[in-house]
From Swiss-Prot:
Record-given protein name: Major capsid protein
Keyword Membrane in record: no
Subcellular location as annotated: Virion; Host nucleus
A single cellular component GO annotation: host cell nucleus
Superkingdom of origin organism: Viruses
Annotated organism of origin: Equine herpesvirus 2 (strain 86/87)
UniProtKB keywords: Capsid protein, Host nucleus, T=16 icosahedral capsid protein, Virion
Function: Self-assembles to form an icosahedral capsid with a T=16 symmetry, about 200 nm in diameter, and consisting of 150 hexons and 12 pentons (total of 162 capsomers). Hexons form the edges and faces of the capsid and are each composed of six MCP molecules. In contrast, one penton is found at each of the 12 vertices. Eleven of the pentons are MCP pentamers, while the last vertex is occupied by the portal complex.
Length: 1381
């Protein structure tokens, strides 16, 4: 074949490839082409075996030149092993001598200890395919008679050569890839290895303390030194830091190998290359740019050493670092003549090296970047391009996942302080944060507030107590030592005599019970979270429910039940303190633009009146005679005006401030000159304040409606018609049944009705006096003849006001009066017959000869009425008392009580038992709110009045004690009963667990300051703990009563550095073999197999892996919150209208179905679609964990478990599940990370808590596919224990290899990466059970300060806080031209 013919061919395709043919001929010594001529016959497939042999020869000629030219080979001893396929197991044994120290103090010398260590070879099989066309093979062996034949011949050679070159190149890359993976398999992460290899740590053994130290050091090194190149970029001494890290890498690995003193690779000047850094192109450029390079080439062997086989055992032909040339020489010197004259090592080396003149291997210069790190010379290389060309992921690029967390809505405890001297305008200590400002990966400032979390907070799963009760039942099946015994259920009274009920209950009572609600309310946050309070804390598992244990039939005798807390104010003050509630009150004022009508001075006047021990008792008589009837007020207006004016003139205080109706009537009828302008203005301001609060409530509630019901009924209890005022004088039941559609019931004694039409038998409506003139005789007969104790009828007047007056009345009795009196009020019953006797049966009243204009005291004899008038310092006329006595004609006989029950709000309707679906209240019919009675007036009052503690706001035991000596004896005998929180009330009157108002609200009323803000606070405390209320409060930026722990998992693409010490791995390269895989009519497919073997020749871990640089953050690090409506589409509220309203308001995914049919999840009936586009990368899903607002902010400033309690149990026994579970869940033990408390979040850390049942897959929730939960890894009990066992085993395995107990021939332990190491590296939060704090602030001003004053920024500013990012990824924050790193 002449060159001219090639040049003149008409196809330019051949011209560019001519040199390739020449190169192939030279490299194969033209033997390949001659060998193909042996393929004779028409069908080349008949001679397949011959071709395989020839192909093997060809492949063997040009194989693996490139691997020896890589710097990766520095870490290897590369040996050709032609009979590798015959090896079944390859092992090397060598000895380890344990050094000893000679002592001169008389101690006995330590004997020499020697271990035989066994190294095992691992075989690797790499293979590739190539396909040769049958037509090309035929053309290759045909004769070339014409120019066209020559052209076809050249084309066939090119095609076959290209296929061969592809296969050879694949094998070359396969060898490099195999060796790199072998190195990675022996390269633990630096944060693990450096810690475990520290003799200062491991020499103490593996006790609990050492394990906990190790975990702490893992975390410290992980945070401080991961991605060290990024940290060095902005460090002041970046070069020194990088050099320190590289030096630590080189010093940490084991540099001792079996081949002592071997130096296969050196610099051109002869310096030994100590190791190699394998990394990515980007990291390599950064390193060389920062450190510079000391050389650009190294000198290494140009060919492989040789190994031989004897039987089934691998026998090394490398001794003391030099290659044995022939097996015969080995046998003659070491095997066949073992008894020859002993020779020195030098003689052996000389003899080995002298054979065949091959004492020195051929060596060549290899291009490579070389750096100098301390006293070590290290080669630096990137093999990334090889993987990029092959479109295969580079093993040194990894995806790491880090979990972050930050709080939303925390409340800073008193005293409020600031560590900033630059922030201005955010000093208001009442400014309660309802948001968190975070920075995403593109430095965009984002706000996470409660609006973002509504798709989780409003889901039915959050409002369902049954999973928590079931989990508690499973976790604590045995009855606790102390079960709740008081206030659980209301009992029907057998009669209507309230005085007798009080007497029967308190007479001889010497035992008192304190409910769990009261105990939690009276405790401080630290006391409740202390391990000593674990029995109480165990049932504090849900922010929306009060759980308690009751006796149940069965061997274990316990059942767990829950009742809804109903309102934000009912959350115990230890978890929602008074200061926090006042911050919410301030938010309510801001949202409603509320301008108070009353001021602190007005409230102080009311409080002084309530605390006045000489409060006029005549006021109670007048109030009883009027009992809410406007006509009677008008009749007695002169007397009322006289009492008001006299009391104001004498003391500067207000009369009748305990009665809403009296204040309303005063404002309506006593204007002008009836009373002084100043005192009348006070009454007007009080009434105006109530109206202003009602208008603010309506304004904040908005104008939406749900199923033709105003949304205010779902947001605030004061607007809910199911809640009635506590004192009833008129027939409010008609309006009640008309407005309420939630199965309302009215219980009078042992009678119950559920509709207004059925109330005729239990309701006696009394009309005006002028309309009852002809029935006075009947009224008198009924009063005298009836058995009123068993007359189950309520005596009420006609209700003539607008329905909204009930809202005003509720605001007065549930907000204004408790706040202004600090709860020092008690319900009071009246015996109207005795009151009439004291009032009317006096001479001047009936004697017509007495002038009606005369002062009655001039004619009144000594008696009850005279004493009361003198004590009240009031001098009415005779006509005034006569008119007052006339009011008795239509008065009821005595004070009664009724029980009203309704089903709860649809958002609160799910319950553990049937009675918990109802909420009740006791109404005091024709009763009054009484202040303390003075000792002087007590004898007279005892004959007419008696205490009726029927409501948490109206059950002050100290006030009741002034009305009833028996109660006074009771509270003196049991001091704990002097507190309204613990005061026991007859179960026939009320039961706290079933009430609207509970101990926490009474506690706030007791302790609040007499200011207008306290009024707003009490109004806001009536906001419901319901999903509709959450939506409303989020819209108005009002705190819902609980904080959030937001958890997010972000993914990072990391570029890693692998450091390997020299000659630490022996690589055996066998011969390739070719097999025919597939034969078709047009082509033959061959598979080239190649066997390799590797053996770790180091005496320890010779390689180490370090994440050096963040290539990219793939997730957006944003505020996209989990949509539980999409995650759990099968769970819905029973009220369909409310459910659809919520989904619309929160922006939940609108599924393709509305029913809770789980089959939709299985047949693709439900699909969760993301946004149509992305701006910052993949959305990182945030999940929220409900958290008490009292959670310690410092907890979130360092890496911790989002559960609120440490979960990393590496210091426990690995397979002792009981010990591990106690560590995680037993709150009678302190949190191992914070000894002074058991948890920071009882709603998530305990078994059966809300967070536990929401994110713990152990409870087998039916979840939609394709949704990721970042919280699950911190809550799933089985995974917790499994990962902790994995971490325990990982530490133990590494310690076994590094801690002074070397592997022996009996243990066969190898220095490889332990199972779980990759998970630890890529998901450290999973093993450590901790999330990292991310940069967040409760106020944007703190972020601005952080960007402007990096060194002096404020982590705390009154009620605001800043949390710095403490994580392995050190981000550069940028806003405008301001940079913070």
């Amino acid at each position: 074949m002449e060159p001219v013919a090639i040049e003149n061919r008409p196809y330019p395709y051949f011209a560019t490839e001519a040199n390739l043919l020449k190169g192939i001929k030279e490299s194969a010594a033209e033997g390949l082409f001659k060998s193909f001529q042996l393929l004779l016959g028409k069908d080349v497939r008949e001679n397949g075996v011959k071709f395989e042999v020839l192909l093997g020869v060809y492949s063997n000629v040009i194989q693996y030149i490139k691997f020896l030219e890589t710097s990766l080979a520095v870490g290897c001893i590369n040996t050709e092993f032609k009979d590798l396929r015959r090896m079944t197991n390859g092992k090397i044994q060598f000895k380890i001598n344990v050094p000893t120290i000679a002592h001169g103090d008389g101690r006995r010398p330590t004997k020499q200890r020697q271990y035989i260590v066994l190294k095992t070879a691992n075989k690797h099989h790499i293979s590739t395919e190539m396909e040769l066309a049958v037509l090309d093979l035929e053309i290759l062996h045909s004769s070339q008679e014409t120019a066209l034949d020559v052209t076809e011949y050249i084309g066939a050679v090119k095609t076959i050569t290209s296929a061969l070159q592809f296969g050879v190149d694949a094998l070359e890359r396969g060898l490099v890839d195999t060796v790199l993976h072998v190195k990675l398999r022996s390269a633990p992460p630096m944060f693990i290895y450096k810690t475990l290899n520290d003799p200062t740590i491991v020499e103490r053994g593996m006790k609990k303390t050492v394990k906990s130290d190790l975990v702490a050091m893992f975390k410290a090194h992980l945070v401080e030194h991961t991605f060290f190149l990024d940290k060095a970029q902005y460090a002041s001494q970046s070069v020194q830091y990088v050099m320190t890290m590289l030096s630590d890498m080189a010093a940490t690995v084991c540099n001792e190998t079996v081949f002592k003193g071997i130096a296969s690779y050196t610099t051109p000047s002869g310096e030994v290359v100590d190791g190699v850094l394998e990394t990515t192109d980007n990291v390599m450029r950064k390193l060389l740019a920062m450190l510079g390079q000391s050389g650009n080439s190294i000198v290494g062997p140009a060919s492989y050493a040789s190994y031989v086989v004897r039987g089934d055992n691998l026998v090394t032909a490398v001794s003391y670092g030099r290659a044995m040339v022939a097996f015969d020489q080995f046998v003659s010197r070491l095997v066949d003549n073992p008894n020859a004259t002993p020779s020195s090592v030098e003689d052996d080396l000389n003899a080995i090296s002298s054979a065949a003149g091959l004492g020195q291997q051929n060596r060549m210069a290899i291009p490579s970047s070389v750096i100098r790190v301390g006293d070590k010379t290290i080669a630096v290389e990137s093999l990334q391009n090889m993987y990029t060309e092959a479109q295969v992921p580079f093993p040194l690029n990894r995806r790491l996942q880090y979990s972050y967390y930050f709080p939303v809505g925390l409340h800073m405890p008193k005293p409020k302080y600031s560590t900033s001297n630059v922030i201005r305008g955010a000093e208001n200590p009442l400014y309660q944060p309802v948001e968190a400002w975070v920075v995403n990966k593109n430095n965009t400032l984002l706000r996470f507030d409660y609006t973002c979390a509504l798709r989780s907070l409003c889901h039915p799963k959050v409002h369902n107590p049954n999973p928590c009760a079931g989990a508690l039942q499973a976790a604590f099946p045995e009855a606790p030592e102390r079960m709740e015994a008081h206030g659980l259920e209301y009992e029907q009274p057998p009669h209507m005599n309230a005085h007798r009920l009080m007497f029967d209950y308190y007479n001889g009572k010497n035992v008192a019970h304190v409910t769990h609600i009261a105990r939690k309310t009276s405790m401080s946050t630290d006391d409740l979270l202390h391990p000593s309070a674990h029995e109480l804390l165990k049932l504090e598992v849900h922010p929306l429910f009060d759980f308690y244990a009751v006796g149940a039939p069965g061997a274990r005798g316990v059942a767990y039940r829950a009742t809804h807390r109903g309102m934000v104010g009912n959350i115990p003050q230890s978890l929602a303190p008074a200061g926090f509630q006042e911050c919410r009150g301030d938010q309510f004022e801001t949202a409603a633009c509320l301008s108070h009508v009353v001021d602190a001075a007005t409230i102080e006047v009311v409080q002084q009146s309530a605390f006045d021990p000489n409060y006029p008792v005549i006021c109670y008589l007048i109030e009883a005679m009027v009992h809410g009837q406007e006509e009677k007020f008008v009749m007695n207006a002169q007397l009322i005006a006289l009492v008001i004016e006299s009391y104001w003139t004498n003391t500067g205080r207000l009369a009748f401030v305990n009665s809403f109706h009296m204040i309303k009537f005063i404002c309506q009828h006593l204007g002008g000159a009836a009373v002084s302008k100043e005192v009348y203005g006070l009454y007007r301001r009080i009434y105006g304040e109530i109206v202003a609060l009602e208008q603010a409530l309506v304004k904040v509630a908005g104008h939406d409606d749900i199923n033709r019901r105003h949304v205010g009924e779902y947001t605030n209890s004061l607007l809910d018609p199911s809640l009635l005022p506590p004192f009833v004088y008129n027939n409010v039941f008609g309006a009640f049944f008309n407005r309420v559609d939630r199965h309302a019931e009215v219980h009078v004694g042992n009678y119950a009705v559920d509709s207004y039409n059925d109330m005729a038998g239990i309701l006696n409506v009394t009309d005006r006096m002028e309309d009852l003139v002809g029935r006075f005789v009947n009224l008198y007969n009924n009063r005298v003849d009836d058995d009123h104790e068993h007359r189950f009828q309520l005596d009420v007047g006609v209700f003539r006001d607008a329905e909204n007056i009930l809202v005003l009345e509720k605001i007065f009795y549930y907000v204004f009066l408790p706040v202004c009196t600090n709860g020092h009020v008690c319900g009071m019953g009246v015996d109207f017959n005795n009151l009439a006797l004291a009032l009317a049966y006096n001479g001047p009243v009936y004697a017509p000869a007495v002038n009606g204009a005369d002062p009655i005291l001039d004619h009144l004899e000594n008696g009850t009425l005279r004493d009361l008038l003198q004590a009240s310092d009031v001098a009415p006329t005779v006509d005034m008392i006569r008119t007052l006595a006339t009011s008795f004609l239509t008065c009821p006989v005595n004070t009664q009580h009724a029980r009203v029950k309704t089903r709860r709000d649809p958002g609160q309707a799910v319950a553990t038992h049937e009675r918990a679906k109802l909420v009740g209240q006791t109404l005091l019919v024709n009763g009054f709110a009484a202040f303390a009675i003075s000792e002087r007036n007590r004898p007279a009052c005892e004959t007419m009045f008696f205490p009726v503690p029927f409501h948490k706001f109206y059950s002050d035991p100290m006030v009741a004690a002034t009305l009833q000596p028996m109660i006074a004896d009771y509270v003196n005998q049991i001091p704990s009963q002097r507190d309204v929180l613990a005061f026991n009330v007859p179960p026939t009157i009320m039961a706290e667990y079933e009430e609207w108002h509970k101990s926490p609200m009474a506690q706030y009323a007791r302790s609040c300051a007499p200011t207008p803000l306290s009024l707003s606070t009490m109004v806001c405390m009536h906001n419901k703990l319901s999903p509709v209320a959450f939506v409303n409060q989020a819209k108005n930026r009002i705190h819902p009563g609980f904080a959030l722990t937001v958890v997010r998992t972000d993914e990072v693409l990391s570029e890693n550095i692998l450091y390997s010490s020299r000659a630490s791995t022996s690589v055996f390269v066998g011969l390739p073999s070719v097999t025919r895989k597939e034969v078709r009519s047009d082509a033959v497919t061959f598979e080239i197999h190649h066997e390799l073997a590797t053996l770790n020749t180091s005496l320890g871990y010779s390689s180490i892996l370090v994440p050096a640089h963040v290539a990219s953050i793939t997730t957006d690090m944003g505020v996209h919150c989990q949509d539980l409506f999409a995650m759990y589409p099968g769970e819905q509220f029973a009220d369909r209208e409310m459910h659809n309203y919520l989904k619309k308001k929160v922006g939940a995914a609108q599924g393709q179905h509305n029913g809770p049919d789980a089959r939709h999840l299985l047949n693709a009936g439900f699909a969760c679609h993301g946004p149509p586009g992305l701006s910052h990368g993949q959305l990182a899903t945030c999940e929220v964990i409900l958290t008490p607002v009292t959670a310690d902010v410092s907890y979130f400033q360092s890496s911790n478990s989002p559960r609120g309690r440490a979960s990393c149990v590496v210091s426990c026994e690995p397979y002792n599940a009981e010990s591990a579970e106690n560590f995680i869940y037993n709150h009678s033990l302190s949190d191992p990370a914070y000894e002074f408390r058991a948890t920071v979040n009882p709603w998530a850390s305990q078994l059966g808590s809300l967070g536990d049942v929401m994110y713990n897959a152990s409870y087998k929730q039916m979840m939609a596919p394709g949704l990721y939960s970042p919280c699950r890894q911190f809550f799933n009990k089985e995974d917790l224990l499994k990962n902790n066992r994995g971490l325990y085993g990982l530490v133990n395995e590494y310690i076994t290899r590094l801690g002074g107990a070397p592997a022996t021939s009996g243990t066969d332990l190898q220095f490889v990466v332990i199972n779980g190491t990759d998970v630890f590296l890529e998901q450290p939060c999973l093993f450590l059970q901790e999330a990292f704090p991310t940069l967040s602030a409760s106020h944007r001003a703190l972020i601005d300060e952080y960007m402007s004053y990096k060194q002096t920024h404020a982590p705390v500013h009154f009620n605001q806080h800043l949390i710095e990012e403490v994580a392995p990824v050190k981000r550069l924050f940028k806003q405008g031209n301001k940079l913070v790193y």
